[in-house]
Each structure stands twice: as C-alpha cells, then as structure tokens.
Amino acid sequence: MTDIARIIEVVEPEAKALGFDLVRVRYFKGGEIGDEEHTLQIMAERPDTGQLVIEDCAALSRRVSDRFDELEEAGDVLIEDAYRLEVSSPGIDRPLTRAKDFAAWIGHEARVELSELLDNRKRFRGELKGFDAETQAISIEDDGVVFEVPFDLVSNAKLILTDKLIAASRPLDTSGADEILEEQED
C-alpha cells in the first residue's frame, strides 16, 4: 500500500527548496481506458504566480526522482509498483486543496465534493462566497442557498472554468514563444 502522507513528507521539502508550494499529490492507477500503469501526480505552483512553467516542472521532477532514488538505495521504497511521475502546474480550473485556495478564489464558481453528507448531499456546485479561517468553513452558494461546508469534510474540489475565471487568471508564461514562432515561419 502506497503511503501518500509519507510521499508528501518527502516531496514537499523538494518543492520548497525550489521556491514552490505543493498543491496536491495523488497516486492512482490508470487514467485512460485500458491503462494499467500507476501515476504519481504532483501539482505545485510558484506562490507569486500560482503556476509553473515547463522548466519548473522539469526541475521538480528531477529533484523528486533523485530523492526517491536515494531513499530506495537506502532501503526506503516509497512506491512498490512501476509508476509514471507527472509533475504539473494546477492549471486554470485548478483543484482547491488547501484552505488558502478557497480564500483566494472567493467569487468564483467551484465544484465541491464531501466525504460525508451535509444537508442530505455530498456535492455542491456554485459560487464561493467566503472562507472563515476561525471555523475552517467554506461558504458556497448553490441554487440560491448558501451552505457552510466544513473544510475537513471536503474530499475533492476544483474551480469551474468560466469567463470570469479566465479574466481573473494570470496569463501563462509565454517566454520563448517568439522563438518558436520564428522557427516555424522559416
């Protein structure tokens, strides 16, 4: 059994060493129909931009791979199965995994799933209205009703792609794009 908490314990310092915040770590089998391979998915971001560029992803991937190799050589095998390592930026319709994610995206639409029933339901979809840091509760308006959702009940949440979200998001880093266009024109 793969211990995600242990993997996070190893990955987070590697991300921090590069100046990144860890957004999410997931370990899953498949992803596409017929795909039996396991994937270790690591999402991270630069605190100032909320994204990573490809070079950042490559740097974190190398650090994590090297650290996992060191631990394995010392007899500490974190993942028994063969797996694919996937390092990425959270993207525009990002997952909301930390309290600060909910606070940062107030006013935007989100889909929130809970680990147990709240008002006879586990799924909410609507505008994030607030986050109470003291009670650790998320306010989300769904069909005109505002629900107070305890953060510790959230099992999965992500932003919903809307025009408002696109307008509010920082553009991706386009450095190097001119060189690519010039090469294609020649």
Swiss-Prot record:
Single GO BP term: ribosomal small subunit assembly
Q: Does the keyword Acetylation apply?
A: no
Q: Which UniProt keywords apply?
A: Cytoplasm, Ribosome biogenesis
Q: Which CDD domains match?
A: YlxS_C (cd01734)
Q: Which GO terms describe its cellular component?
A: cytosol
Q: What does this protein do?
A: Required for maturation of 30S ribosomal subunits.
Could you tell me which NCBIfam families the record lists for this protein?
Answer: PRK14636.1 (NF011229)
Q: HAMAP family per the record?
A: RimP
Q: What is this protein called?
A: Ribosome maturation factor RimP
Tell me what organism the protein belongs to. Novosphingobium aromaticivorans (strain ATCC 700278 / DSM 12444 / CCUG 56034 / CIP 105152 / NBRC 16084 / F199)
Q: What is the lineage of its organism?
A: Bacteria, Pseudomonadati, Pseudomonadota, Alphaproteobacteria, Sphingomonadales
Q: Which gene holds the coding sequence for this protein?
A: rimP
